[in-house]
Amino acid sequence: MADVDSHLAGGSLVSRGFYSIVRNILVFLCLVVTRVRVVDRHKVPASGAFILAPIHRSNIDSPLASAVTRRRMRFMGKDSLWKVRPVGWVLSALGGFPVSRGTADREALKRCVAVLDSGEPLVLFPEGTRQSGPKVHPLFDGAAYVAVKAGVPIIPVGIGGSERVMPK
């Protein structure tokens, strides 16, 4: 977990540059493949920490979520993604960190608060995992817990049509 922790306090200049390059490529590809339209972008804080809480239907949701702001977005991902070395390295370099699903992963919650305390925004999918269909599934309370602990707002985000672009 040391590699993950090294990226929590703002990340290195290389990590930030890597994020910017990858984000721009992914957002460009999303714009080419989809009809991305961001509504009420002005409601996303230009500075300070906040939690971006999108609905999760597809693997394309994370890059789409980063389209709402040019700021670096930090995120959690299922820990199994970090077990594949190159994937885990890339996710960590992009500002991600693992969460053990199915348990109350206190370390991941502490990392969330640390990211927010450092002033960076954080993407948390309140449904916990990718779901199917247009209905919003029951939400886990992790995003609300972290928001209260860190004293930051939650910005809800709806993403329509991503399941058609990249099905579960």
Describe the function of each predicted region.
Residues S15, R23, L31-K168:
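Soluble catalytic domains of membrane acyltransferases
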